[in-house]
């Protein structure tokens, strides 16, 4: 059975784990506590067991030493061995070739194995071992006799069993307390994470970009603040996108409507039986169509450049701003060969987006050329401000920009009343500002001739970078080197 392309799609998020993070934290706490409890229990059991066995061995050694040093074994061995029956030990005295004396507790028999036989035969001086649930000590005496003493391990085993029970209960309580504490800590610690999760789900479900309240100053508070920064950036991006779409639609509607009207007139004039239009009107319509197509092309190009700058992801590279100015001047000069350019530039390198910087400089020059009268002059200067910054100044002899509009001209699609009669999309200076700010620079607008009539406009573009070593030389727009040390060069 064949499935159509793209017929299968996941219906929801894939599960990441069978256990929630809270349960995993609690299980981790339980596991760590259980491991510590087991290690401590084993250590305590081993230490106590060793201590009990050492105490039992010391008791056997003390009892044997007491019997030997008292002399009762030599004086009356039978009575001395019988006396041990009233204590808690089993005893045996072996006198080779004569007799064996024994005294056992009720229900017990002193074990006699190979180690004890080796002591009796004199092959070993002493042996100590565990046999038949008893601790057995055998000592070979100086007179050739052998003394054997044993004691039941039942009391010791009972103490160790009780100790194991206590350790098990205490360990279980510790693990349970650790589970409860781990759950409480996980619940309290993951509460901000839960708020972040709810916020993310709310954003995905409703597009609600309200920030989350930040509580405290710990790592989770920093995570919340970072998430809020992401929400603010997303809100700004959506606002810019909506504004761009709205403004672009508005700006495209006018030239498209005019273009459609002109095309319909041209088509109607070509229909059979239609009255012919005068040639001058036909030429005017065709010129209008071409102008409107060029306006649309410019607007679409500006929109592409603007969205390109918004998208980012551009690999920076060293850019020689003098070369950028040279190339931009060549393009502007082809469009406006009726004005002169006074160029005074130095070698200055900026680490950034070559295409974006070129577009910014070209827009400044285009704007200055657009507002300059025929035969006017446009000044282009690139000079060093300090050891880290240089400034590009583009000056024209146009009507200037009123102070109240100098901030607005960098807004997208903003066009003053005077600018609406001129070609353009209202995006040129917005692109300039976006490029300059992305490179860590700044923009300002002054009058070319303060108080003049017309005052003109000078746009100052400050860019960080470094000087390109070229002592005693200034580059012109034509690419030659002027050895006069930075004099103004006029090009046409």
UniProtKB/Swiss-Prot annotation:
SUPFAM superfamilies: ATPase domain of HSP90 chaperone/DNA topoisomerase II/histidine kinase, HAMP domain-like, Homodimeric domain of signal transducing histidine kinase. Residues 1-27, 187-492 are cytoplasmic. The chain crosses the membrane at residues 28-48, 166-186. Autophosphorylated. Its EC number is 2.7.13.3, 3.1.3.-. Residues 470-492 are annotated as: Disordered. Keywords: ATP-binding, Cell membrane, Hydrolase, Kinase, Magnesium, Manganese, Membrane, Nucleotide-binding, Phosphoprotein, Protein phosphatase, Stress response, Transferase, Transmembrane, Transmembrane helix, Two-component regulatory system, Virulence. PANTHER family: SENSOR PROTEIN CREC. This is Signal transduction histidine-protein kinase/phosphatase MprB.
């Amino acid at each position: 059975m064949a499935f159509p392309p793209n017929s299968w799609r996941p219906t929801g998020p894939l599960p990441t784990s069978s256990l929630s993070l809270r349960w995993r934290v609690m299980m981790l706490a339980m596991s760590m506590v259980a491991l510590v409890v087991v290690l401590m229990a084993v250590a305590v059991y081993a230490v106590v067991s060793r201590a009990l066995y050492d105490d039992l061995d010391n008791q056997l050694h003390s009892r044997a030493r007491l019997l030997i040093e008292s002399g009762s074994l030599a004086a009356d061995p039978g009575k001395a061995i019988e006396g041990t029956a009233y204590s808690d030990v089993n005893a045996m005295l072996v006198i080779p070739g004569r007799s064996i004396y024994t005294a056992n507790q009720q229900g017990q028999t002193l074990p006699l194995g190979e180690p004890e036989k080796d002591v009796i035969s004199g092959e070993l001086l002493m042996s100590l071992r565990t046999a038949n649930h008893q601790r057995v000590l055998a000592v070979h005496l100086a007179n050739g006799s052998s003394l054997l003493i044993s004691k039941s391990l039942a009391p010791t085993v009972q103490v160790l069993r009780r100790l194991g029970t206590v350790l098990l209960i205490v360990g279980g309580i510790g693990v349970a307390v650790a589970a409860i504490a781990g759950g409480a800590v996980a619940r309290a610690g993951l509460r901000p994470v839960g708020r972040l999760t709810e916020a993310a789900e709310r954003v995905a479900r409703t597009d609600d970009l309200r920030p989350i309240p930040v509580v405290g100053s710990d790592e989770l508070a920093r995570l919340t603040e970072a998430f809020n920064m992401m929400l603010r950036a997303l809100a700004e991006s959506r606002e810019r996108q909506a504004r761009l779409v709205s403004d672009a639609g508005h700006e495209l509607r006018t030239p498209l409507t005019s273009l459609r009207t002109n095309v319909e007139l041209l088509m109607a004039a070509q229909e059979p039986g239609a009255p012919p239009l005068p040639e001058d009107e036909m030429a005017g319509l065709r010129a209008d169509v071409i102008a409107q197509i060029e306006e649309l092309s410019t607007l679409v190009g500006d929109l592409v450049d603007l969205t390109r700058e918004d998208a980012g992801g551009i690999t920076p590279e060293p850019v020689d701003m003098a070369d950028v100015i040279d190339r931009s001047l060549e393009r502007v000069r082809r469009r406006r060969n009726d004005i002169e350019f006074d160029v005074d530039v130095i070698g200055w390198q900026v680490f950034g987006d070559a295409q974006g910087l070129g577009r910014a400089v070209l827009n400044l020059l285009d704007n200055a050329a657009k507002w300059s009268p025929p035969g006017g002059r446009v000044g282009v200067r690139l000079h060093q401000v300090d050891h880290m910054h240089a400034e590009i100044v583009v000056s024209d002899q146009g009507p200037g920009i009123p102070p109240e509009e100098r901030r607005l001209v960098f807004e997208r699609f903003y066009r003053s009343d005077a600018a609406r009669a001129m070609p353009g999309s209202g995006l040129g200076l917005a692109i300039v500002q976006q490029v300059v700010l992305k490179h860590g620079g700044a923009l300002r607008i002054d009058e070319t001739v303060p108080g003049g009539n017309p005052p003109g406009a000078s746009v100052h573009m400050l860019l960080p970078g470094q000087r390109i070593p070229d002592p005693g030389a200034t580059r012109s727009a034509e690419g030659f080197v002027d050895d006069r040390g930075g004099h103004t060069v006029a090009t046409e």
